[in-house]
Amino acid sequence: MNRAEKREFVTWLNEAFRKSGSVVVAHYSGLTVLQMNSLRSKMGEAGGAVKVAKNRLAKIALQGTESESIVDLFTGQTLIAYSEDPITAPKVAVDFAKNNDKFVILGGSMGATSLSVDAVKSLASLPSLNELRAKLVGMISTPATRIAQIVNAPAGQVARVIGAYAQEGKTA
């Protein structure tokens, strides 16, 4: 990479850090190309991205962002997993780490908050934003459904009684 390419990459990475809801930093030493491609595709399907960057360039890109506090995590062969949804990157990274012992999560950030390895794992256990929205809609619509059932119940009971009398009249 020449200087202009490095400058452009740092600018792009800085923008990615600014837009991301969460960032996960991990060591990937020893992973095969197939495993890395698997991680990238899983992260992409979930709405996140994985980027391998030189530590020096990543540290420069972190300057002036909310995630600047994680600069110390960039030692050795590190990769960056990030997503706009704060739950996506940690969830995919933790799931991938369960099956690949050479993938070691170092920590991360969510906005201005630095995350330890345990914090990343606990964040991964939370439901995604879409799952939370679905639960909220379910909680709101359930009482309305029950009210409709209660209001319609007497009419249904009357109809069943009339139906029973009609059946009795036919058999008698």
From Swiss-Prot:
Pfam family, one: Ribosomal_L10
Record InterPro entries: Ribosomal_uL10, Ribosomal_uL10-like_sf, Ribosomal_uL10_bac, Ribosomal_uL10_bac_type, Ribosomal_uL10_CS_bac
Keywords noted in UniProt: Ribonucleoprotein, Ribosomal protein, RNA-binding, rRNA-binding
Role noted for this protein: Forms part of the ribosomal stalk, playing a central role in the interaction of the ribosome with GTP-bound translation factors.
Subunit structure as annotated in this protein's UniProt entry: Part of the ribosomal stalk of the 50S ribosomal subunit. The N-terminus interacts with L11 and the large rRNA to form the base of the stalk. The C-terminus forms an elongated spine to which L12 dimers bind in a sequential fashion forming a multimeric L10(L12)X complex.
Family: Belongs to the universal ribosomal protein uL10 family.
Name by which UniProt lists this protein: Large ribosomal subunit protein uL10
Organism: Bartonella quintana (strain Toulouse) (Rochalimaea quintana)
Encoding gene per record: rplJ
